[in-house]
Amino acid sequence: MRVVPTLAAASLALGAVAGEHVERQLILGGGEVPIGTKTYATGIRSTADGNAFCAGALVSPTHVLTTAACTGFEPPKFVAVGTHYINGTKDGEQIKVVSAQNHTLNNASSASYDFALLTLEKPSKFSPIKLPNPDDSDIVAGMWTKVMGWGDTSYPNGTRSNELQSVGVEVWNNEDCARLFVVDNSSVCAGGAPGRDACVGDTGASLVKEKGQGDADDILIGLSSWGSGCGDPGIPSVYSRVSTAIEWITSVTKVQQV
């Protein structure tokens, strides 16, 4: 478990919440994602075949969106796109990272605008996930979304999952979340159902709105950022709200949202 050193300011507002503040790195209470689906889900690695230490999402053929926190753990050297597994090279693509760029408004002390873009050495053959509308119309409090990653499947003292996992979590409005955490408009909260959460082992995991039968209609709503404890009843996790970063993403990737 990594205690979040950048959230000291946020901790002042957490008197009502028990537990320590941890980077969101676990898929708790979920199930295995079918092989060959959610291929935009990306593992971030130090070596081509090593364990993913963070997650992200393919948002253009040559760019992966993750959290700024993930660029601070250790330098992202490779991404694994379209793979079902936490490590190895038996499926998907392993592509070298040539540069990493944090959001221009990122504030590590408050985890505000917790975004980073990784530029890849070559284009991925997999389809990028759709980005949300910048007017925030794709997010409605009370809707159900899915978060996916390779983090621990139990808490505490869990072990990493070898296979991509996902779990359904409910979106909160920021007013309710602000009663528990210090959040701004670059964040969105989701979760709160007992034992169903993102937690220890996979910061940057995709929070996705499923609109149709297939992955082509999925929309990237958020990226797993931080929280307090894992799977506690009535306590959500905090995600980076992707709709607030569309202009910056477009400026870096040079790809216009269709």
UniProtKB/Swiss-Prot annotation:
Q: Chief location of this protein?
A: secreted
* Record: glycosylation sites: N87, N102, N107, N157, N185
The signal sequence is 1-19
Q: Name one GO cellular component term.
A: extracellular region
What keywords is this UniProt entry annotated with?
Disulfide bond, Glycoprotein, Secreted, Signal, Virulence
Q: Does the keyword Metal-binding apply?
A: no
Coiled-coil region: none
Q: What induces it?
A: Expressed during infection and the expression levels increase with disease progression.
A GO biological process of this protein is:
proteolysis
Which residue pairs form cystines in this protein? Answer: C54-C70, C177-C189, C199-C230
The answer on whether this UniProt entry bears the keyword Disulfide bond reads yes
Q: Which GO terms describe its molecular function?
A: serine-type endopeptidase activity
Residue ranges constituting the Peptidase S1 domain according to the UniProt record: 27-254
Q: What does this protein do?
A: Secreted effector that suppresses host plant glucan elicitor-mediated defense responses. Targets host endoglucanases and inhibits the endoglucanase-mediated release of elicitor-active glucan oligosaccharides from P.infestans cell walls.
Q: Which family does it belong to?
A: Belongs to the peptidase S1 family.
Q: Quaternary arrangement and interactors, per the entry?
A: Forms an apoplastic complex with host endoglucanases in tomato leaves during P.infestans infection.
What's the protein called, per UniProt?
Glucanase inhibitor protein 1
Q: What is the lineage of its organism?
A: Eukaryota, Sar, Stramenopiles, Oomycota, Peronosporales
